[in-house]
Amino acid sequence: MKYVKFLPRKSLMSKNTLTVTVAGENSLIAYLSTKTDPMIAAKIQRMTEALRVNLKSCLIDLIPSYASILVIYNPLLTDHFAVSKSIYAAAQLADKADEGAFDTAGGALVKLPVYYDVESGPDLAGLAVNAGLTVEQVIAIHQSVEYRVYAIGFAPGFAYLGEVDERIAASRLATPRQKVPKGAVAIADRQTAVYPAVSPGGWNLIGLCPTLMFDPNKEPSMPVKTGDRVVFEAISREEFIDLGGQLNDVEGQQ
Protein backbone atom coordinates (compact mmCIF):
# COMPACT_ATOMS: atom_id res chain seq x y z
CA MET A 1 0.00 0.00 0.00
CA LYS A 2 1.29 3.46 -0.89
CA TYR A 3 1.31 6.06 1.91
CA VAL A 4 0.72 9.77 1.64
CA LYS A 5 1.50 12.52 4.09
CA PHE A 6 -1.01 13.43 6.78
CA LEU A 7 -3.33 16.05 5.34
CA PRO A 8 -5.21 18.51 7.59
CA ARG A 9 -8.14 18.87 5.23
CA LYS A 10 -10.12 16.73 2.83
CA SER A 11 -8.11 15.47 -0.14
CA LEU A 12 -8.51 13.25 -3.18
CA MET A 13 -7.94 9.51 -2.83
CA SER A 14 -6.18 7.27 -5.32
CA LYS A 15 -6.25 3.52 -5.64
CA ASN A 16 -4.38 1.65 -2.88
CA THR A 17 -3.54 4.91 -1.10
CA LEU A 18 -4.17 5.50 2.59
CA THR A 19 -5.39 9.03 3.24
CA VAL A 20 -5.93 10.49 6.70
CA THR A 21 -8.09 13.60 7.03
CA VAL A 22 -9.43 15.69 9.88
CA ALA A 23 -13.06 14.97 10.74
CA GLY A 24 -13.33 17.20 13.81
CA GLU A 25 -11.42 18.73 16.70
CA ASN A 26 -10.75 15.29 18.17
CA SER A 27 -11.33 12.92 15.27
CA LEU A 28 -9.65 11.66 12.12
CA ILE A 29 -10.85 9.53 9.21
CA ALA A 30 -8.57 7.02 7.52
CA TYR A 31 -9.63 6.12 3.97
CA LEU A 32 -8.23 2.94 2.44
CA SER A 33 -10.18 2.77 -0.78
CA THR A 34 -13.14 4.10 -2.73
CA LYS A 35 -14.69 0.68 -3.29
CA THR A 36 -16.06 -2.28 -1.37
CA ASP A 37 -13.72 -5.25 -1.38
CA PRO A 38 -13.17 -8.27 0.94
CA MET A 39 -9.44 -7.54 1.16
CA ILE A 40 -10.09 -3.93 2.13
CA ALA A 41 -12.65 -5.07 4.72
CA ALA A 42 -10.09 -7.47 6.19
CA LYS A 43 -7.51 -4.68 6.42
CA ILE A 44 -10.05 -2.41 8.08
CA GLN A 45 -10.65 -5.12 10.67
CA ARG A 46 -6.92 -5.59 11.34
CA MET A 47 -6.35 -1.84 11.60
CA THR A 48 -9.27 -1.47 13.99
CA GLU A 49 -7.88 -4.17 16.27
CA ALA A 50 -4.41 -2.59 16.21
CA LEU A 51 -5.74 0.89 16.96
CA ARG A 52 -7.70 -0.36 19.96
CA VAL A 53 -4.45 -1.73 21.38
CA ASN A 54 -2.19 1.18 20.42
CA LEU A 55 -4.44 4.06 21.49
CA LYS A 56 -5.81 2.38 24.63
CA SER A 57 -7.06 5.01 27.12
CA CYS A 58 -6.68 7.81 24.56
CA LEU A 59 -9.46 6.31 22.48
CA ILE A 60 -13.08 7.41 22.78
CA ASP A 61 -14.49 5.45 19.85
CA LEU A 62 -13.58 3.66 16.63
CA ILE A 63 -16.16 3.46 13.85
CA PRO A 64 -15.08 1.21 10.97
CA SER A 65 -17.03 1.27 7.73
CA TYR A 66 -16.80 -0.19 4.21
CA ALA A 67 -13.38 1.28 3.42
CA SER A 68 -12.63 3.76 6.19
CA ILE A 69 -12.20 4.14 9.93
CA LEU A 70 -13.34 7.10 12.02
CA VAL A 71 -11.05 7.54 15.04
CA ILE A 72 -12.37 9.65 17.92
CA TYR A 73 -9.89 10.35 20.70
CA ASN A 74 -9.50 12.24 23.98
CA PRO A 75 -7.80 15.56 23.09
CA LEU A 76 -6.55 15.92 26.66
CA LEU A 77 -4.41 12.81 26.21
CA THR A 78 -3.22 12.96 22.60
CA ASP A 79 -3.45 14.95 19.37
CA HIS A 80 -3.97 14.66 15.60
CA PHE A 81 -0.29 14.07 14.90
CA ALA A 82 0.13 11.20 17.36
CA VAL A 83 -3.12 9.56 16.29
CA SER A 84 -2.22 9.81 12.60
CA LYS A 85 1.09 8.07 13.35
CA SER A 86 -0.86 5.29 15.07
CA ILE A 87 -3.13 4.98 12.02
CA TYR A 88 -0.18 4.58 9.65
CA ALA A 89 1.43 2.07 12.01
CA ALA A 90 -1.81 0.06 12.07
CA ALA A 91 -1.95 0.15 8.27
CA GLN A 92 1.60 -1.17 8.05
CA LEU A 93 0.68 -4.07 10.33
CA ALA A 94 -2.26 -4.85 8.05
CA ASP A 95 0.04 -4.75 5.03
CA LYS A 96 2.48 -7.17 6.66
CA ALA A 97 -0.38 -9.59 7.18
CA ASP A 98 -1.33 -9.04 3.53
CA GLU A 99 2.16 -10.05 2.40
CA GLY A 100 1.61 -13.44 3.98
CA ALA A 101 -1.52 -15.57 3.78
CA PHE A 102 -3.89 -12.74 4.65
CA ASP A 103 -7.12 -14.05 6.12
CA THR A 104 -10.01 -12.49 4.22
CA ALA A 105 -12.26 -14.85 6.18
CA GLY A 106 -11.30 -13.18 9.45
CA GLY A 107 -13.83 -12.16 12.06
CA ALA A 108 -16.33 -14.35 13.83
CA LEU A 109 -18.73 -16.51 11.85
CA VAL A 110 -22.28 -15.73 12.97
CA LYS A 111 -25.26 -17.84 11.95
CA LEU A 112 -28.65 -16.13 11.85
CA PRO A 113 -31.90 -18.11 11.51
CA VAL A 114 -34.49 -16.81 9.06
CA TYR A 115 -38.12 -17.70 8.46
CA TYR A 116 -38.34 -17.14 4.70
CA ASP A 117 -41.91 -17.01 3.43
CA VAL A 118 -44.37 -14.68 1.71
CA GLU A 119 -46.02 -14.40 5.14
CA SER A 120 -42.85 -13.07 6.77
CA GLY A 121 -41.35 -11.49 3.65
CA PRO A 122 -43.99 -9.52 1.76
CA ASP A 123 -41.57 -8.62 -1.06
CA LEU A 124 -40.24 -12.15 -1.54
CA ALA A 125 -42.65 -13.20 -4.29
CA GLY A 126 -42.27 -9.96 -6.23
CA LEU A 127 -38.49 -10.11 -6.02
CA ALA A 128 -38.58 -13.67 -7.35
CA VAL A 129 -40.78 -12.68 -10.30
CA ASN A 130 -38.55 -9.71 -11.17
CA ALA A 131 -35.47 -11.93 -11.01
CA GLY A 132 -37.04 -14.66 -13.15
CA LEU A 133 -36.65 -17.14 -10.31
CA THR A 134 -38.88 -19.14 -8.02
CA VAL A 135 -39.31 -18.16 -4.38
CA GLU A 136 -37.40 -21.30 -3.43
CA GLN A 137 -34.49 -20.30 -5.65
CA VAL A 138 -34.32 -16.81 -4.13
CA ILE A 139 -34.21 -18.33 -0.65
CA ALA A 140 -31.52 -20.82 -1.65
CA ILE A 141 -29.37 -18.12 -3.23
CA HIS A 142 -29.74 -15.72 -0.29
CA GLN A 143 -28.64 -18.29 2.27
CA SER A 144 -25.84 -19.70 0.10
CA VAL A 145 -23.57 -16.67 0.57
CA GLU A 146 -21.19 -15.92 3.43
CA TYR A 147 -21.68 -12.18 3.97
CA ARG A 148 -19.20 -9.70 5.40
CA VAL A 149 -20.30 -7.08 7.95
CA TYR A 150 -19.07 -3.93 6.23
CA ALA A 151 -20.57 -1.31 8.54
CA ILE A 152 -22.96 -0.71 11.45
CA GLY A 153 -25.65 2.01 11.13
CA PHE A 154 -28.15 3.74 10.43
CA ALA A 155 -29.47 2.48 13.76
CA PRO A 156 -27.69 0.53 16.53
CA GLY A 157 -27.48 -3.09 15.42
CA PHE A 158 -28.23 -2.41 11.75
CA ALA A 159 -25.40 -4.31 10.04
CA TYR A 160 -24.79 -3.69 6.35
CA LEU A 161 -23.89 -7.07 4.84
CA GLY A 162 -22.43 -7.72 1.43
CA GLU A 163 -22.44 -8.76 -1.17
CA VAL A 164 -25.78 -10.18 -2.29
CA ASP A 165 -25.65 -12.45 -5.33
CA GLU A 166 -26.39 -10.25 -8.34
CA ARG A 167 -29.20 -12.60 -9.40
CA ILE A 168 -31.32 -11.46 -6.45
CA ALA A 169 -30.08 -7.88 -6.10
CA ALA A 170 -33.09 -5.56 -5.94
CA SER A 171 -33.55 -1.80 -5.98
CA ARG A 172 -35.04 -0.05 -2.98
CA LEU A 173 -38.81 0.36 -2.91
CA ALA A 174 -40.17 3.41 -4.71
CA THR A 175 -42.31 4.14 -1.64
CA PRO A 176 -40.69 3.18 1.67
CA ARG A 177 -42.78 1.49 4.33
CA GLN A 178 -43.74 3.52 7.35
CA LYS A 179 -43.21 0.48 9.55
CA VAL A 180 -40.71 -2.32 9.03
CA PRO A 181 -40.86 -4.94 11.81
CA LYS A 182 -37.98 -5.78 14.10
CA GLY A 183 -36.06 -8.72 12.70
CA ALA A 184 -37.03 -8.12 9.07
CA VAL A 185 -34.46 -9.59 6.68
CA ALA A 186 -34.13 -7.32 3.68
CA ILE A 187 -32.27 -6.68 0.43
CA ALA A 188 -31.34 -3.38 -1.20
CA ASP A 189 -29.16 -3.53 -4.30
CA ARG A 190 -26.30 -5.88 -3.37
CA GLN A 191 -26.64 -5.37 0.37
CA THR A 192 -28.69 -7.32 2.88
CA ALA A 193 -29.50 -6.61 6.52
CA VAL A 194 -31.66 -7.45 9.51
CA TYR A 195 -33.67 -4.55 10.93
CA PRO A 196 -32.82 -4.35 14.67
CA ALA A 197 -35.98 -2.45 15.62
CA VAL A 198 -39.29 -1.27 14.19
CA SER A 199 -38.58 1.64 11.84
CA PRO A 200 -39.44 3.09 8.44
CA GLY A 201 -37.54 1.49 5.58
CA GLY A 202 -37.37 1.02 1.84
CA TRP A 203 -35.58 -2.31 1.54
CA ASN A 204 -37.19 -5.45 0.10
CA LEU A 205 -38.43 -7.72 2.89
CA ILE A 206 -37.84 -11.44 2.31
CA GLY A 207 -38.11 -12.97 5.78
CA LEU A 208 -37.86 -12.57 9.53
CA CYS A 209 -35.01 -13.32 11.94
CA PRO A 210 -35.84 -14.03 15.61
CA THR A 211 -32.33 -13.11 16.81
CA LEU A 212 -32.18 -9.82 18.72
CA MET A 213 -29.74 -7.62 16.80
CA PHE A 214 -29.34 -4.97 19.50
CA ASP A 215 -29.77 -5.20 23.26
CA PRO A 216 -28.31 -2.33 25.33
CA ASN A 217 -28.56 -4.48 28.45
CA LYS A 218 -26.19 -7.14 27.10
CA GLU A 219 -22.43 -7.14 26.60
CA PRO A 220 -21.73 -7.15 23.75
CA SER A 221 -24.92 -5.35 22.77
CA MET A 222 -24.88 -6.75 19.21
CA PRO A 223 -24.33 -10.31 17.94
CA VAL A 224 -22.15 -9.02 15.08
CA LYS A 225 -19.44 -6.42 14.59
CA THR A 226 -17.69 -4.94 11.58
CA GLY A 227 -15.47 -7.54 9.96
CA ASP A 228 -17.55 -10.53 11.06
CA ARG A 229 -19.02 -13.01 8.60
CA VAL A 230 -22.72 -13.86 8.54
CA VAL A 231 -24.60 -16.80 7.09
CA PHE A 232 -28.38 -17.13 7.06
CA GLU A 233 -30.06 -20.45 7.77
CA ALA A 234 -33.69 -21.16 6.85
CA ILE A 235 -36.01 -22.24 9.66
CA SER A 236 -39.68 -23.21 9.73
CA ARG A 237 -42.56 -21.09 10.96
CA GLU A 238 -42.78 -23.23 14.09
CA GLU A 239 -39.06 -22.85 14.81
CA PHE A 240 -39.33 -19.10 14.29
CA ILE A 241 -42.12 -18.81 16.86
CA ASP A 242 -40.33 -21.14 19.30
CA LEU A 243 -37.31 -18.82 19.11
CA GLY A 244 -39.46 -15.85 20.12
CA GLY A 245 -40.34 -14.51 16.69
CA GLN A 246 -43.55 -12.56 16.06
CA LEU A 247 -45.54 -12.20 12.85
CA ASN A 248 -48.15 -9.59 13.70
CA ASP A 249 -46.08 -6.53 12.68
CA VAL A 250 -45.47 -7.42 9.03
CA GLU A 251 -47.01 -4.98 6.54
CA GLY A 252 -48.22 -6.17 3.16
CA GLN A 253 -46.44 -6.06 -0.16
CA GLN A 254 -45.75 -2.62 -1.61
Tell where the protein language model's regions lie, with residue ranges.
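Glycine-rich active-site loops that engage anionic ligands at enzyme catalytic sites
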Residues: 2-8, 12-254
